[in-house]
Amino acid sequence: MLCNIINIAALVVFGVGLPLLICLNNIHILQQNSYRNSRYRRWFSLKNYLSTFKWTRKQKLPLVYTPRVKRLIATCVILIIIIQAGIVLLTQNMYCGYLLTAFAFLIVQAANILNAPIEKSIAQGYYNDAKRILESMPNLTIVAVTGSYGKTSTKHYLHKILSEKFITLMTPGSFNTTLGVVRTIREHLKPYHQVFIVEMGAKQVGDIEEICKLVNPSIGIITAVAEQHMETFHSLENVLKTKFELAESLPADGLLAINNDFPAIAENHRQYKCRTIRYSQTQADVHLRNISYSSSGTKFEVVAKDWSIELQTSLVGKYNLSNLTASVIVAKELGLTDQQIKIGVSRVEQVEHRLSIKRQPSGITVIDDAFNSNPYGAQMALDVLSGFPSKRIVVTPGMIELGDKQFEENKKFGAQIARSADIAIVVNKVNADAITEGLREGGMDNSKIMVAKNLFEATTILNKISAAGDTILYENDLPDMFK
């Protein structure tokens, strides 16, 4: 009798608990892939799948136990119990059920499919509620911001500037999907808000159009079109098409501001029904001039055909100035005075983990550009790093989601690091071969090139080699699905 009780307890603990533990790691990855099975399957490989068994591994972003995740866990538990019971009945061997842990990936995918009708119904209800809220605010000005990169920073800059005149709301964090925007509207948008700034992210054709159908923006900003998320977009043409879904959605009396510094945008001469303003660091409808840097930040002038404005900001880097230029264009369109714009720009702060400079009590300067990375942004970060006279150290895992150009771009990145830094610490083996090859071709000595398994190991190395007066650039941090 006691033996049977022990066996049953073991079956519950190991036969259900162990598969569920592995399922939680898989649910974590599914959540980072927007609960889309197609993206989840693309992530799956033997190498990646085996990594889900490392449940003690520290995560960059922990699993968020949303109501959806809790429903998914409940369905997984039910599936595990049913399958385990079937295995025991068929084999008459309770230990065979432990093999179910090897199929956690399939259990999570099946649970996601089974829950899909319920989730779709719930999401539609939330969507309809958000739509109703927007329709009840006909005087609300909605500004949409999208781009391969730069959209989050631009959103923050624009929010700070427009707040000098309007009661403004922006989508928080990286809430840039349809469901993220829906949640923002339902939880944060109030009748007293005058401007709503919506960040729009995309990983495949149609994503921007979907958000536009919800919010119907009257003003849009496209910060960049470049090779990003290529595993899902497959081509630069698809990236361009998707970003310009915003242009297609704007009304005839609307305004579109686009960054002409990117060739894909500059070469797109299609006419849209809305008014279009091209901005650039050099020559365009609106451009920059008289840029000067100092220890306190940057002075620059934004120039248009019939107006110009001199500004000062604590931000550094030309790409940040481009994002500010787009914000100034929208501020002008919405009637802010030059004085309001100047005050707003002077109050803009760097967004956390996006080229923010921090001076540590130890005397070390940290350039934190760890949110994500791309060829354009990485070059700008290295340009900033090269301006520091002290020993310069780069800590990076390289760039991801660049499709078949990933090796080539990371090799170029390595060569750029060699020209801008004294020491390189390459984190993770995802891009290690490409970056180290570029570092060597760029002329960096092997003794200055180090490879760390993870950020924790990189930190240990830094503690040994860094000293007061040094400058450390953290360029990118890989999502958990790549670790």
How would you describe each model-predicted region?
Residues 222-365, 390, 411, 415-423, ...:
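Acidic, Mg2+-coordinating active-site environments of NTP-dependent enzymes
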Residues 2-75, 79-256, 260, 264-272, ...:
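Phosphate-binding loop of NTP-binding sites
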Residues 191-194, 296-300, 467-476:
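A polyampholytic, Gly/Pro-enriched intrinsically disordered region
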Residues 153, 179, 206, 322, ...:
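Residues that form or flank phosphate/diphosphate-binding pockets in enzymes
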Residues 1-94, 99-116, 330-337, 343-353, ...:
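ATP-dependent carboxylate-amine ligase
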Residues 158, 162, 181-185, 324-334, ...:
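Buried hydrophobic packing segments
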Residues 182, 208, 233-236, 324-325, ...:
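Conserved strand-to-helix beginnings and helix N-cap segments that scaffold or border functional pockets
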Residues 146-148, 172-173, 200-201, 224-225, ...:
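Fold-independent oxyanion-binding glycine-rich loops
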